[in-house]
Amino acid sequence: LEHELVAARYDLKHLFRLILNSTTYQRSHISPTEDSQGEENFACYPLRRLEAEVLIDALCQISGTREQYSSIIPEPYTFMPEDQRSVALADASITSPFLEKFGRSSRDTGLESDRSDRTTAAQRLHLLNSSHIRQKIEGGPKMQPLIHWSREKNEEAVTELYLTILSRFPTEEEFEI
């Protein structure tokens, strides 16, 4: 990759194109064989859940909203600037109910095992039924126009949703759904 980057005169788009079109990057998470050694032999990649901070940042990015944070320690440096993302939270005392529910580490010990990456029923219910997520979708400036489009513009709305959420165009099969 180093030689390719230099040969392309440090063109990052060229480097991204090279990586994204490689077979390594396009591997499936499904093992090509029945045995359990697919992961060990790098024949597939293991799926893992997004960390709490990354997930809320993605939801805020999609909806155009921001998360509200609070701190149990009332000190001046617990104020969060509007443009700061959850992944940049340096102080573990600054948190939100979403971060706690989705397994953000309290950073008491500094061990990786403090973070919970398990998917729980409470997390599923929060994503499916919570007023928090509903307010982000319905109240977000990015989603408002897409929600209120008329039936005549249905195909255009679906395309915009796919581009906003998945950064790709929908397939023909997805349009039919």
Locate predicted features.
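Extracytoplasmic/periplasmic ligand-capture domains
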Residues: L1-R9
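An acidic, gly/pro-interrupted, aromatic-rich
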Residues: V6, K13, T24-T171
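Helix-loop-helix junctions that connect adjacent transmembrane helices in secondary transporters/permeases
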Residues: E172-I177
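Alpha-helical secondary-structure segments
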Residues: D11-N21
